[in-house]
Amino acid sequence: MANVVVVGSQWGDEGKGKIVDWLSERADVIVRYQGGHNAGHTLVIDGVSYKLSLLPSGLVRGKLSVIGNGVVVDPHHFVAEVEKLRGQGIDVTPDVLRVAENAPLILSIHRELDAMREGSNSGLKIGTTKRGIGPAYEDKVGRRAIRVIDLTEPETLRPKVERLLAHHNSLRRGMGLEEIAVETILTELTSVADQILPYIDQVWRVLDERRKAGARILFEGAQGALLDNDHGTYPFVTSSNTVAGQAAAGSGLGPTAIGYVLGITKAYTTRVGEGPFPTELNDEIGEFLGTKGHEFGVVTGRKRRCGWFDAVIVRQTVRTSGINGIALTKLDVLDGLEEIKICVAYELDGKRIDYLPSSMGAQARVKPIYETLPGWSETTAGARSWNDLPAQAVKYVRHIEELIGAPVAMLSTSPEREDTILVTDPFHD
């Protein structure tokens, strides 16, 4: 019985929410292992929509859900999201939700710093959600973060906050901002401590025990591999590692526990925020994809940039994340197009290349090299078997498999979880 890592293979927004929900019914434990509440996803169950950005998707199924140490946790958002789910009739208790005691916290100073940097006229605009994710990770690697476990030790919390503010207040002075008092942060933390502490645990131990007992573990990735801090389109990336390897480091369960990596892949390409996007379409086709695909961010509401499927970046992600198979989503959005293009390579300074270069300058200069395939007039929406798909749609899917070097394990044809074609069960050894 394999444990499964779900990772976005593009720039996020690939439709991971539905696939994770589909898989969570087969899983015993669902784990968030990176990111924060900056990337949202929507689950539709029995006609009810659940919008999550921090809590694992398994909660709506009553499965044990874990927030790993690789996640940065905004405690106030945590409480608000828990209460929102309870308001929708979901039972959220420590029996079904655990938070890593060594997870770092996002504080108000992180959110304010994030917004100040992004709103500045100087420097590079990355397109962050301004939710404090980046500054919180900075404090983590700077060894000055306040972690969840620190809330259990009030006697040592003050000196930790003092050390944290020694850094942040120096930044604030340089930006012309008023300094933050220690009492302000202490009050912020103590006001929410009683509401988050019942959920904390040594999640590495919990996961190890469940694995040894034969539980199926699903690792739920956020965002996409092209936003990875190392392997993405740097500096237009997020502040954590989003490739599949982070599932081990961000949960405390060793890499040998990972059995199958499923890459969630949209049948076309989208991106939110700034950064290179070789196949972006600023024309009526781009508008068609955005409108039909409802391409607006769950967290920010920002309109997503849209373009043709880019086999180069997905092929690269297949390698950097060790993807065994992909779940191809939103195929139905392409219904009705007379022809469909796929980017098979790039041209860089007159030369053909089959990879996305690392430098920002080169990424901005690459030009897509396309193959054109005939589209289809029939609908794929709601298809639940290969026989339900138009012949040209099947050819499109098969060609994607050839180009990226990975098979399609699942195919999604609508937001409804039942409209899914299963080719390979990721949980099956």
UniProtKB/Swiss-Prot annotation:
CDD domains: AdSS
Binding site for IMP: D13, E14, G15, K16, N38, A39, G40, H41, T129, R143, Q223, T238, R302
InterPro entries: Adenylosuccin_syn_GTP-bd, Adenylosuccin_syn_Lys_AS, Adenylosuccinate_synth_dom1, Adenylosuccinate_synth_dom2, Adenylosuccinate_synth_dom3, Adenylosuccinate_synthetase, P-loop_NTPase
EC numbers, comma separated: 6.3.4.4
Cofactor(s) the record lists: Mg(2+)
Catalysis performed (reactions): IMP + L-aspartate + GTP = N(6)-(1,2-dicarboxyethyl)-AMP + GDP + phosphate + 2 H(+)
Residues that coordinate or bind substrate: V298, V299, T300, G301, R302, K303, R304
Pfam families: Adenylsucc_synt (PF00709)
Gene assigned in the entry: purA
GO annotation (BP), single: 'de novo' AMP biosynthetic process
Protein source organism: Brucella canis (strain ATCC 23365 / NCTC 10854 / RM-666)
Chain residues that bind GTP: 12-18, 40-42, 304, 330-332, 412-414
GO cellular component: cytoplasm
Quaternary structure, from the entry: Homodimer.
Record-given protein name: Adenylosuccinate synthetase
